[in-house]
UniProtKB/Swiss-Prot annotation:
CDD domains to which the protein is assigned, alphabetical: R3H_NRF
A single GO molecular function term of this UniProt record: DNA binding
Signal sequence range: none
Chain ranges of the G-patch domain: 551-596
Protein name per UniProt: NF-kappa-B-repressing factor
UniProt short sequence motif Nuclear localization signal, positions renumbered to this chain: 25-45
Length: 690
């Protein structure tokens, strides 16, 4: 600053423009504007010399000096780094702003003659910027301290839950993850092959490349208060919210109508966020009615952040203390490995261990070591306790170690009592019917090869309830009981994932031995009497062709008067013999007509077919071919409902067809089947054993 003033000595540029707000001068004949000194003596103007020494340039405090010593002392130079070489991004904006405002106000107080004479506009605008900065949630100093004391803004107390060493470690991990994201984005295998990038696969692959796994926390939107849901997401009523975390660091939150959709939306936002300049901060977030500290990833340079409420309970993030190396010990580490509870919701041992660790909120880790004979040894650690080890290749050793670890954990599992969890599939029984129905009146309704579907259809057909009750046996084995109307039909023992299918199969076999079975053959083969598109369109053509020209027709009378007696037209009768058939014209058909619109079937033709079927006494169903479009099938559904018929579509895609039939009671269908043996595509099979 002294150098600039020294350079500007002796230079006079005349009067400088004023940056203060000035009122316009009143015109002649008008009264002057009222001022703050009305009724008082206005202050006298101080006499001053017109010519005096004035700085040629306005003093700008961020001009750097040229010497190395001054550059080192410059508080606005490069930011200092810690011992590990990583920048403390979290402290950079606040420290920089405090030094900046402090020097600015010191210039105002120390060099007031230059500020007042030249209208130092930068310092005049400074309080506005200060308010803008501290409106984002940081405590703002009072105006008195800005003008008089010039004290910097008070810093918040350091976090006791997350020490600086932990934040620096998480910052290093996020920088490593960001580099991995950019590396995968430049990989053509990740972006080519499809128009849309699979962000979930990319984020999972990048996080696993950093030797860890992502964490997804789901919550139904019904359980979240409406005030905590973003305004643009309030249209969702039955959706889900998904929070993505990694190493206890919050990344993003996604909202969608399903769990997979919310996860995909959250991972997409996370990948886009990791492509920017980001940092790890400790902020206060809300979880239901509790406010606690949390580690979050936010963009550098953004002063205000609006984070959605946390979906993970804050008690899962509590630091209980520090170990010998100074690292924090979290609540999950306080659990002993013997309290581990196995949840059998996977097929292999690795999946069971990972899912169980997530359920118990414990940490499981696999460590590899190459042996002298060029084989790999994999050891499984649960809560830093070695459970088992396996040998082989890097892949087979992990599976072998997981199998051995699972056997060790199964031995330590306590003997649980029968843990029951039921799934009830109830039929459409009438309300208020509390009478228990007899199993002897049950009719097995077989509409699928899956025994679970057969049992559910049977329960709905007979208006009964079916339940599947699980009982935990030893190890990974479970017992499943099938209960129909409070009566046990069958049971099976096996793995939880397949024991339900086995128990349902045994129940169907047991019921077929004593109860009649109605088999629906509609899905088992092609239907013979299928109504095609041409058959529907041919009805209009046949009716138009059958129309007879009457004697009082004007055209007929004109031809008779000209000598036509019948037969072909023309002198020798070589013309047409039959009248021109009526051609239907929809709306304004003509040049440029879409061919597909011409091939559409008429609604009155469909209604005529269904009306004739409803008035007849036929017991077979109407089956429309797969040539019909979605709109045409929609019309058939509406017309069938109009005449009190039931309609249902079967198949997928181009193989989808529609069946229209009568609403039958179970008793009427059984009576017809007993008399005729087969009604339409229904077939009756009597019990195999008495």
């Amino acid at each position: 600053m002294e150098k600039i003033l020294h350079m500007a000595e002796g230079i006079d540029i005349g009067e400088m423009p004023s940056y203060d707000l000035m009122l316009p001068k009143p015109s002649k004949g008008q009264k002057r504007y009222l001022s703050t000194y009305d009724g008082q003596n206005p202050p006298k103007k101080q006499a001053g010399s017109k010519f005096h020494v004035r700085a040629r340039f306005e003093p700008v405090h961020f001009v750097a000096s040229s010497s190395k010593a001054e550059r080192q002392e410059d508080p606005y130079g490069p930011q200092t780094k810690d011992v590990n070489g990583r920048t403390h991004f979290a402290s950079m904006p606040r420290n920089f702003y405090q030094d900046y405002t402090q020097d600015s106000f010191s210039i105002q107080d120390g060099n007031s003659q230059y500020c007042n004479s030249s209208g130092f506009i930068f310092t005049k605008d400074q309080p506005v910027a200060t308010n803008m900065y501290f409106d984002s949630g940081n405590p703002a100093p009072s105006s008195t301290s800005q003008q008089a004391n010039c004290q910097p803004a008070p810093e918040p107390p350091p976090s006791q839950m997350y020490p600086e060493s932990l934040v620096a470690e998480k910052q290093y991990f996020i920088e490593k993850l960001t580099a991995t994201i950019w590396k995968n984005l430049s990989n053509p295998e990740m972006t080519s092959g499809s128009d849309k990038i699979n962000y979930t696969y990319m984020l999972t692959r990048c996080i696993q490349a950093c030797k860890t796994n992502p964490e997804y926390i789901y919550a139904p939107l019904k359980e979240i208060p409406p005030a905590d849901i973003p305004k643009n997401k309030k249209l969702l009523t039955d959706g889900y919210a998904c929070e993505v975390r990694c190493q206890n660091i919050y990344l993003t939150t996604g909202y969608a109508g399903s769990k997979n959709g919310s996860r995909d939306r959250a991972t997409e936002l996370a990948v886009k966020l990791l492509q920017k300049r980001i940092e790890v901060r400790v902020v206060r977030r809300k979880f239901k009615h509790i406010i606690g500290e949390d580690l979050v990833v936010c963009q550098i340079g953004m002063l205000s952040y609006e984070f959605p409420p946390a979906l993970k309970p804050p008690e899962d993030l509590v630091v209980l203390g520090k170990d010998a190396s100074g690292q924090p010990i979290f609540n999950s580490s306080a659990k002993h490995w013997t309290n581990f509870v196995i949840t059998e919701n996977a097929n292999d041992a690795i999946g069971i261990l990972n899912n169980s660790a997530s359920f118990n909120k414990m940490s499981i880790e696999y460590k590899y070591e190459m042996m002298p004979n060029r084989t790999w040894r994999c050891r499984v650690f649960l809560q830093d306790h070695c459970l088992a080890e396996g040998y082989g290749t890097k892949k087979t050793s992990k599976h072998a170690a997981a199998d051995e670890a699972l056997k060790v954990l199964q031995k330590t599992q306590p003997t649980y009592p029968s843990v029951k969890s039921s799934q009830c599939h109830s039929g459409s029984s009438p309300k208020g019917s509390g009478k228990k129905k007899d199993i002897k009146d049950l009719v097995v309704y077989e509409n699928s090869s899956n025994p679970v579907c057969t049992l559910n259809d049977t329960a709905q057909f007979n208006r009964m309830t079916v339940e599947y009750v699980y009982e935990r046996m030893t190890g990974l084995r479970w017992k499943c009981k099938v209960i129909l109307e409070s009566e046990v039909i069958a049971e099976a023992v096996g793995v939880k994932k397949s024991v339900k299918y086995e128990a349902a199969g045994e129940a169907v076999k047991t019921l077929k031995k004593t109860q009649p079975t109605v088999i629906n053959n509609l899905k088992k083969g092609t239907v013979e009497d299928v109504i095609s598109r041409n058959e529907i369109q041919g009805r209009s053509a046949e009716e138009a062709y059958k129309q007879q020209i009457k004697e009082d027709n004007i055209g007929n009378q004109l031809l008779r008067k000209m000598g036509w007696t019948g037969g072909g037209l023309g002198k020798s009768g070589e013309g047409i013999r039959e009248p021109i058939s009526v051609k239907e014209q929809h709306k304004r058909e003509g040049l440029g007509l879409d061919v597909e619109r011409v091939n559409k079937i008429a609604k009155r033709d469909i209604e005529q077919i269904i009306r004739n079927y409803a008035r007849s006494e036929s017991h077979s169903d109407l089956t429309f071919s797969t040539e019909l479009t979605n709109d045409e099938r929609k019309q058939i559904h509406q017309i069938a409902q109009k005449y009190g018929l039931k309609s249902k579509s079967h198949g997928v895609g181009h193989d989808r067809y529609l069946v229209v039939g009568r609403k039958r009671r179970k008793e009427d269908l059984l009576d017809q089947l007993k008399q005729e043996g087969q009604v339409g595509h229904y077939e009756l099979v009597m019990p195999q054993a008495n």
